[in-house]
């Protein structure tokens, strides 16, 4: 624990020369509002918001370039509260600064329908750049924002001197001990150093207290040394009241352009709560009426009043609105001058901000003739990306060290990064479009979210479907935010073969489909893959993330695939030859991905027994379920109860479509190490097995 002598030193104020009494009053107002808000609702996290009051005030009122009247301003600095549990750290600044929150919003913290939920939520509260709460995600996504900022500079103003472009700005982060403990921040911080992201400035609130009290029980490392080892520019500031040290550290960080900056700020959580500061009780619970009253007495507030804000304090802090507009106007002059110099790049920016695709963008998408050589859908996806590359400069992405397997490299594209990281295989350029995440799947997921949130480019990242498990927290958060991230997940079943059960996805398709707002797209062949990419890129403005599920093994190019059908999520690929117009089939075979070919072959076997089968390709259940009832009933007539679903994964998500009388050809156990043909045969993924299931469904 921190000694009383250390607490005294850490809480000794150091203010710059232009700091006034009203600045101190504003900081104390933040502390009291945080204590009052949590006390009123009865739960929450007051301590960090209290001890970080000087830092938050300094960032929002004295450092960051932003305009409270336009929270979407292209030239703004971004702020990420990775320590999302301390949401009041952000909310109170948004209130004081005039971003759209009022005192009543602070009073309604964590209540139904309020603008101030327990953790900050993107799209919900003006001024919130990203949903945070699951620790580590914010810092990792901020790395993506910093990468996006550089890539966008390359698209729009590549030749400007550092700091001279209207597209230059900073990404500021506040991270906690918990953020630092999470593995995703280690992954992302390592990559940030590789990328030399000089526009990223992270404040680490080193208060050494968590829910279980003193973090020494679980965190003993020299975190600053760890970040130095990564290659970050590292500074240490003693004391959360040390505004002079905070501002000096910010200035130093801004001057370092070839490395991200890490500022370890030693604070005393809950200061100035006399009995609970520097304890776990200040972290995640209301302080209690007596302790809140004691805090108010210490800072000169009336202990019998709640939510006190002096009029002169609010007038002072709301002055940020005018200052922000002035900064915006100065920036606008620079932006307008750039627009006159760069009319073509300005047109590109306008198109991206309008979320439009260029005319003819999909005219050169590859097409494969039915019956041509079998092709893995991952290979088809790679061909599609290379065709799209010249038309869509906003499209960029890569892989978690599996580019050759995922086929995620756009042909001819340089790698993104400082030239110094170039290898024999890859030429890096500051503004390249091929991303190398390394074996950092979790960070990749969070970084993609940061890129998309920063806007306005489109980013994708690839790995094996099995390793989507490593990405799941970031994927869920992207779905919660309804942002348009793209995940390319290949090697999608036991069909990957010899790598064996550790790498063969079994439960993954159903597990991913369980995430609300995530679209899981598993095309049947090369053409469906092209149609899927077309649909994914045409979906914008909060359509939600998409996981594109692709095969390792070759699959035949099928007859009858349909672009509109793919966009609708499911469609009739083939009806039995003897079926008359308007006549319903005897049985419906529903399949996805590499198993659609089995349904087509089973249709022929069933026809030999005078059973008329319909084959439905269902690349995306989520898109299909969003269609009108009329369309869904036309594809899957309710009167046809004999149904079979075929997918090389667990059956869990298919019962809703096949019903109690239907059959599911699935795999409910882990695989083995063997070639894909052997595995499909031994585990019952054959045309004969599908036909037999159809006959059972007819008998049910």
UniProtKB/Swiss-Prot annotation:
User: Residues that bind substrate, according to the entry?
Assistant: 45, 283, 378, 405, 491, 499, 552
Cofactor binding mode and count: Binds 1 Mg(2+) ion per subunit. Can also utilize other divalent metal cations, such as Ca(2+), Mn(2+) and Co(2+).
> Recorded E.C. number(s)?
2.2.1.1
Q: Which reaction does it catalyse?
A: D-sedoheptulose 7-phosphate + D-glyceraldehyde 3-phosphate = aldehydo-D-ribose 5-phosphate + D-xylulose 5-phosphate
Report the coiled-coil segments: none
> Which residues are tagged with the site Important for catalytic activity?
45, 283
Q: Which UniProt keywords apply?
A: Calcium, Magnesium, Metal-binding, Thiamine pyrophosphate, Transferase
May I have one GO cellular component term?
A: cytosol
CDD domains for the chain: TPP_PYR_DXS_TK_like, TPP_TK
**Catalytic residues, chain numbering:** 441
Check the record and name the PROSITE patterns matching this protein. Answer: TRANSKETOLASE_1, TRANSKETOLASE_2
- Which of this chain's residues are annotated to bind Mg(2+)? 177, 207, 209
Q: Which cofactor does it need?
A: Mg(2+); Ca(2+); Mn(2+); Co(2+)
Oligomeric and partner information: Homodimer.
What function does the entry list?
Catalyzes the transfer of a two-carbon ketol group from a ketose donor to an aldose acceptor, via a covalent intermediate with the cofactor thiamine pyrophosphate.
Record's protein name: Transketolase
State the organism named in the record.
Mycobacterium bovis (strain ATCC BAA-935 / AF2122/97)
Q: What is the lineage of its organism?
A: Bacteria, Bacillati, Actinomycetota, Actinomycetes, Mycobacteriales
């Amino acid at each position: 624990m921190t000694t009383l002598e250390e607490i005294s030193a850490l809480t000794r104020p150091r203010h710059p020369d232009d700091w006034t009494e009203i600045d101190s009053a504003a900081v104390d107002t933040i502390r009291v509002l945080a204590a009052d808000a949590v006390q009123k609702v009865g739960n929450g996290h007051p301590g960090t918001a209290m001890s970080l009051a000087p830092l938050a005030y300094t960032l929002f009122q004295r450092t960051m370039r932003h305009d409270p009247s336009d929270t979407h301003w292209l030239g703004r600095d971004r702020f990420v509260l990775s320590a999302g549990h301390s949401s009041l750290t952000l909310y109170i600044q948004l209130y004081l600064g005039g971003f759209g929150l009022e005192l009543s919003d602070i009073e309604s913290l964590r209540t139904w329908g309020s603008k101030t939920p327990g953790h900050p939520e993107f799209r919900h509260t003006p001024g919130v750049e990203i949903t945070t709460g699951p620790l580590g995600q914010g810092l990792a996504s901020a790395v993506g924002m910093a990468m996006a900022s550089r890539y966008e500079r390359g698209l729009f103003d590549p030749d400007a001197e550092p700091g001279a472009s209207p597209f230059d700005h900073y990404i500021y982060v506040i991270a906690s001990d918990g953020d630092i403990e999470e593995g995703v921040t280690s992954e992302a911080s390592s990559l940030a150093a590789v990328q030399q992201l000089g526009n990223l400035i992270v404040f680490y609130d080193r208060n050494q207290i968590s829910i279980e009290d003193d973090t020494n029980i679980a965190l003993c490392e020299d975190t600053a040394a760890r970040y130095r080892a990564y290659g970050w520019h590292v500074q240490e500031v003693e004391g959360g009241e040390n505004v002079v040290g905070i501002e000096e550290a910010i200035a130093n960080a801004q001057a370092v352009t070839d490395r991200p900056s890490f500022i370890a700020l030693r604070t005393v959580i809950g200061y100035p709560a006399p009995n609970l500061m520097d304890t776990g009780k200040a972290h995640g619970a209301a302080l209690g009426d007596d302790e809140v009253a004691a805090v108010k007495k210490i800072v000169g507030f009336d202990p019998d009043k709640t939510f006190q804000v002096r009029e002169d304090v609010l007038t002072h802090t709301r002055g940020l609105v005018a200052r922000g507009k002035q900064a915006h106007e100065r920036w606008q002059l620079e932006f307008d001058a750039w627009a006159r110099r760069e009319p073509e790049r300005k047109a590109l920016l306008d198109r991206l901000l309008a979320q439009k695709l260029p005319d003819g963008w999909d005219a050169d998408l590859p097409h494969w003739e039915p019956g041509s050589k079998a092709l893995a859908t991952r290979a088809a996806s790679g061909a599609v990306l290379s065709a799209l590359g010249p038309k869509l400069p906003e499209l960029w992405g890569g892989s978690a060290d599996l580019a050759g397997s995922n086929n995620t490299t756009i042909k001819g594209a340089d790698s993104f990064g400082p030239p110094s990281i170039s290898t024999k295989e890859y030429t890096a350029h500051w503004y390249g479009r091929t991303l190398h995440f390394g074996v950092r799947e979790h960070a990749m997921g969070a970084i993609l979210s940061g890129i998309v949130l920063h806007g306005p480019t489109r980013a994708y990242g690839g790995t094996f479907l099995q390793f989507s498990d490593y990405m799941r927290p970031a994927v869920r958060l992207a779905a919660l935010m309804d942002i348009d991230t793209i995940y390319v997940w290949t090697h999608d079943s036991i069909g990957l073969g010899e790598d064996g059960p550790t790498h063969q996805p079994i439960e993954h398709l159903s597990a991913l489909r369980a995430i609300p707002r995530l679209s899981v797209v598993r095309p049947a062949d090369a053409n469906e893959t092209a149609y899927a990419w077309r649909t994914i890129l045409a979906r914008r403005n909060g359509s939600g993330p998409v996981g594109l599920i692709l095969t390792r093994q070759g699959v035949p190019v099928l007859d009858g695939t349909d672009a509109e059908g793919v966009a609708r999520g499911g469609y009739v690929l083939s009806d039995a030859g003897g079926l008359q117009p308007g006549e319903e089939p005897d049985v419906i075979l529903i399949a996805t991905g590499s198993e659609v070919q089995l349904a087509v072959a089973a249709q022929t076997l069933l026809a030999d027994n005078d059973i008329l089968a319909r084959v439905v390709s269902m690349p995306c259940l989520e898109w299909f379920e969003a269609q009108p009832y009329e369309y869904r009933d036309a594809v899957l007539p309710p009167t046809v109860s004999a149904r079979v679903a075929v997918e090389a994964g667990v059956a869990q998500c298919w019962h809703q479509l096949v019903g109690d009388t239907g059959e599911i050809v699935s795999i409910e156990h882990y695989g083995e190490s063997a070639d894909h043909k052997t595995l499909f045969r031994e585990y019952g993924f054959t045309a004969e097995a599908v036909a037999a299931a159809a006959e059972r469904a007819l008998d049910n």
